[in-house]
Amino acid sequence: MQRREFVVGTLAAASAGAYLGNNLSAGESPPSTHTGVAKMPFEQPPLPYPMDALKPLFSEEQVSFHYGKHHAAYFKNLNGLVEGKPEAQMSLDDLVVKGSGAIFNNAAQAWNHTFFWNCLSPTGGREPNGELLAAIVRDFGGMAEFRKLFTDASVKVFGSGWGWLASDKQGKLEIIPAGNADNPLRHGKTPLLTVDVWEHAYYIDYRNERARFVENFWTKVNWDFVAQCYAKAKA
Ligand code: MN
C-alpha cells in the first residue's frame, strides 16, 4: 500500500515539473525522485531549446502549455495505460506502428510532439539543400510549390491532426495530411517533417487562425533535422 502511494506520488510530481528541469528543488530527495522516474517506461525528452527561443513563431506561453501540459500529459497517460502490461516493454516506435486504442493514441502523440519540436529550431527557416532539395524539386516542382502544397494540406486537415512530409524507402517524397494521432510510420513511410495543427498548438498565439500559424511555421523549420531524417529513410 505504501509502495503504491509512493509510486503514484512520484508520477504526479514528475508530470508537474520533472521535465521542466525543476524536479530537484531544494528539500526534495534526489534518490527518491530518481527511483520514481526510473519506474516510468516512457520519458518526455527535454525541449531542444529554451521555451522562449521560437519567438516570434511561438510565445513562451504557447510553448510552455504545449510542451509542459499537452505533450507531458501524453507521456503521463501512456505510462499509466501500460503499467503492468506487455506494452511497457515495447519501444515508443513499436507502439506507434503496432499499438491500438488509447495506448496508440497517447504513444503516437508522445512521439509526434517530440518529432515536432525537433523539426523546429531558433536558427531554422533557411532553405534545404543537397539531396533533400533535389528530391523536393523532383517530386513537387520546387520549394515554393512544396511549401504551398504542404501548407494547404495541413491547413485543410479536418479537426485535429498533423501535416507530414514523409519518404518511402526509395526516397520518394509524399505529403500526408493526418487526423488525430496518425503517423507515416503506421503506413510504412519515414516521417521527415511535421506541423501540429491541433488547436492547442497555436490557439494562445494565433487564436483560430490556423492558416497564419502554418505560414509562420516555415520561419523556424530545422532543415538540417529534416535532411538527417531523409538520409536515414533511404539507408
Ligand atoms: Mn500538440
Q: Residue spans of the language-model regions?
A:
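All-alpha RGS (Regulator of G-protein Signaling) helical domain and cognate RGS-like helical scaffolds
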Residues: 69, 80-89, 94-98, 102-167
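Extracytoplasmic/secreted envelope proteins and their assembly/folding machinery
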Residues: 75, 114-117, 133, 147, ...
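Short helix-capping/linker segments at secondary-structure and domain boundaries
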Residues: 19, 23, 118-128, 207-210
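C-terminal segment of N-terminal export signals and the immediately downstream linker at the start
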Residues: 20-54
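An amphipathic alpha-helical core segment
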Residues: 152-224
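N-terminal secretory signal peptides and thylakoid transit peptides that target proteins
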Residues: 1-14
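Long, compositionally biased interface segments
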Residues: 220-234
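Alpha-helical scaffold segments that form or flank carboxylate-/histidine-based iron centers
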Residues: 56-70, 91-112, 180-182, 187-196
